[in-house]
Design a protein with these regions (language model features):
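Alpha-helical transmembrane segments of multi-pass membrane proteins predominantly involved
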Residues: 1-195
Length: 197
């Protein structure tokens, strides 16, 4: 297996673990600014690095082209990283960086667990990146659930607010119904087409 294909996902996962560990190690007053600055800097650097991963146009008739394409698959074709996937991953990373910048004052003044906010945001980003490269229903479902569960928790992160708790419960109920509906549709497609999930 070519683990370089999932290098972006590994990097985001490591950043999420870093945010949790640094929140435990650093004093409460310093943790927010330090963690936020490091994460924004790291994600921006990775965003720029991803420009080097783009592949030029390939001629499928050339023997070398098939080897290049095969090298972009991971775990028996369940995961594929092409230029489209790279583009959307860059957009997701950019959106996460802007979210961290705009939410900085809110995290500092309102939220009690600041490191967990960043870790959950990164786990949602990880789910989005998995969605961008998914080639089958199972991988797509895992990425979607990783993203939505992180958003459920982030919605209810303001524990002192009844509105936040109410919004989290409503979001959870609507998300559960939509997930069940999607799984039902996936099972119908699988049963009718006899393709691999």
């Amino acid at each position: 297996m070519n683990f370089a294909v999932i290098s972006t996902e590994i990097f985001i996962l490591c950043l999420g673990l870093f945010a949790i560990v640094m929140d435990l190690v650093l004093p409460a007053k310093e943790s927010h600014k330090s963690i936020g600055a490091v994460l924004i800097f790291a994600l921006t650097g990775w965003f720029l690095y991803m420009f080097t991963l783009y592949q030029g146009p390939l001629n499928p008739m050339e023997p070398e082209a098939m080897a290049v394409i095969a090298d972009k698959f991971f775990y028996q074709g369940m995961y594929f990283v092409d230029n489209y996937a790279l583009f959307f991953k860059q957009m997701f990373i950019l959106a996460t960086v802007f979210t961290m910048l705009f939410a900085s004052d809110y995290v500092q003044s309102v939220l009690r667990y600041k490191g967990e906010f960043y870790a959950l945001l990164l786990m949602a980003l990880l789910g989005m990146c998995v969605l961008a490269s998914a080639t089958d229903f199972l991988t797509m479902f895992i990425g979607l659930e990783l993203m939505t569960i992180s958003f459920y928790i982030l919605t209810g992160a303001r524990m002192s607010s009844k509105d936040s708790s109410e919004a989290a419960v409503k979001y959870l109920i609507i998300g559960s119904v939509s997930t069940a509906t999607m799984l039902y549709g996936i099972s119908l497609v699988y049963g009718l087409s006899l393709i691999h999930i």
